[in-house]
A protein has these predicted regions:
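A general structural motif
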Residues: 18, 94-96, 119-120
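Short, flexible loop segments at the rims of nucleotide/cofactor-binding pockets, characterized by
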Residues: 72-78, 98-102, 177-180
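PAPS-dependent sulfotransferase catalytic domain
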Residues: 103-195
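Short beta-strand segments
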Residues: 23-25, 98-101, 124-126
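PAPS-dependent sulfotransferase catalytic core
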Residues: 1-92, 153
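Short, contiguous strand/loop micro-motifs
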Residues: 21-22, 96, 174-176
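Glycine-rich phosphate-binding loop used to anchor ATP phosphates in small-molecule kinases
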Residues: 85-111
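Short, well-ordered coil/turn elements that cap or connect secondary structure elements
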Residues: 39-41, 94, 117, 194
Length: 195
C-alpha cells in the first residue's frame, strides 16, 4: 500500500516533469533577492511565499484529525490529496525547476520525504538577527502603513496588547517565540537538529 502511494506520487511528479526545491529561513534575509536571481534562469521559477505548506497542514488536520472523518478513515486517499497540493499548485508553471518558498518548511521537513518521496533540499537564507531587527525598524520608519492603508502588523499587535510603540518593544515582539523572527529561528534550529 505504502509503495503504491509512493509510485502514484512519483508518477504525478514525473508527469508534471518538475524538480522541487524549498526555500525557508529567516525574514528579511534575502529570500526575495535570491528568488529574483533564480528567476533570471528561464528553467527556474521562484515566486513569493506560497500557501502550499499551510494548505497541506489544513488538509492533514481535516482529513486525518477531524472527528467527523475518523469513523470512515481513508489514509491512502488523504495522503494522495495532501501530496497533490505541491504539483497542482505549480501545474500552471512551464519551468522544470520550482522553488517553493515558505518559512514553515523548516518545521514541516518531514512532509517532503513523507508526501513527495524526495530528499529534502531546503535553501535557508540567514542574516544576523540584529540586522534583521534593524531592517524591520527601518521598514516601519519608512512606511508605518501596509499596502492596504492599515498600520503595520508589528504596531498593530502592540496596540492590541496595550504596549507602547517603541523600537525596543517592536524588537522584543519580533524576537519573541510568537514573533515572526522568533518562530523562524526556532523552525530553523528544529530543522538543523533533526538533520
Amino acid at each position: 500500500m505504502k509503495e503504491m502511494i509512493k509510485e502514484i506520487i512519483r508518477e504525478e511528479m514525473s508527469r508534471l516533469n518538475k524538480t522541487y526545491y524549498f526555500m525557508a529561513g529567516l525574514p528579511r534575509s534575502g529570500s526575495t533577492l535570491l528568488s529574483s536571481i533564480l528567476n533570471q534562469n528561464p528553467r527556474f521559477y521562484s515566486g513569493p511565499s506560497s500557501p502550499v505548506v499551510p494548505t497541506m497542514i489544513a488538509l492533514e488536520n481535516s482529513l486525518a484529525n477531524d472527528e467527523l472523518f475518523l469513523g470512515y478513515p481513508k489514509p491512502q486517499q488523504a495522503k494522495e490529496i495532501i501530496a497533490s497540493v505541491l504539483p497542482q499548485y505549480y501545474s500552471d508553471r512551464p519551468e522544470p525547476v520550482i522553488f517553493d518558498k515558505n518559512r514553515s518548511w523548516t518545521v514541516r521537513m518531514e512532509y517532503i520525504p513523507g508526501y513527495f518521496d524526495i530528499a529534502p533540499k531546503v535553501i535557508c537564507p540567514v542574516r544576523d538577527t540584529a540586522e534583521i531587527l534593524t531592517s524591520f525598524i527601518s521598514m516601519i520608519r519608512r512606511n508605518p502603513y501596509q499596502v492596504d492603508g492599515r498600520i503595520n502588523f508589528i504596531d498593530e499587535m502592540l496596540i492590541k496588547n496595550n504596549i507602547p510603540l517603541t523600537d525596543d518593544n517592536r524588537c522584543e515582539l519580533l524576537a519573541s517565540p510568537a514573533g515572526i523572527l522568533g518562530q523562524s529561528v526556532e523552525g530553523l534550529q528544529k530543522a538543523l537538529m533533526e538533520g
